[in-house]
């Protein structure tokens, strides 16, 4: 068990059950925009316990707020987290949290900037092949 306060942002069908099991954890429900950013920026580590997410954009949102990530070494976190720079991937999330505390928050912010919506859109467009309209020989 880790010391410190634990906050869960988000919601789901198990919230009532989990609230009863973890009385030392605050369950805040969904947060958006500036309010979400404020909560993330005020934290020490973002714990991403999922074993099944395919990408995990919430990890990039946390990094954009300067928050290092502690996650399992599975698809999603493996694709997003730079091990030892923006987060720690470990089967033991407690150990991952402890190690993530030592990471430089500015590295997290800088890395997240590489994956902003604008840069992602530019990358997507750069992979599109030009199409030739019917009846024309050259792409437009």
Feature annotation, model-predicted:
Residues 56-59, 77:
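Short glycine/serine-rich donor-binding loops of glycosyltransferases
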Residues 64, 68-71:
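Short hydrophobic beta-strand element within catalytic cores of glycosyltransferases
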Residues 51:
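Aromatic "clamp/platform" in nucleotide-sugar-dependent glycosyltransferases that forms part
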């Amino acid at each position: 068990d880790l010391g410190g306060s634990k906050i869960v942002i988000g919601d789901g069908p198990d919230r009532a059950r989990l609230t009863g099991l973890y009385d030392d954890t605050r369950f805040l429900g969904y947060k958006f925009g500036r309010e979400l950013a404020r909560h993330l920026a005020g934290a020490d580590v973002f714990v991403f316990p999922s074993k099944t997410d395919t990408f995990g954009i919430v990890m990039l949102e946390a990094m954009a707020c300067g928050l290092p990530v502690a996650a399992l070494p599975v698809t999603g976190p493996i694709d997003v987290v730079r091990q030892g720079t923006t987060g720690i991937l470990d089967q033991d999330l407690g150990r991952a949290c402890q190690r993530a505390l030592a990471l430089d928050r500015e590295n997290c912010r800088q890395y997240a900037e590489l994956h902003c919506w604008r840069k992602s859109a530019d990358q997507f467009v750069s992979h599109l092949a030009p199409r030739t309209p019917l009846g024309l020989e050259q792409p437009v």
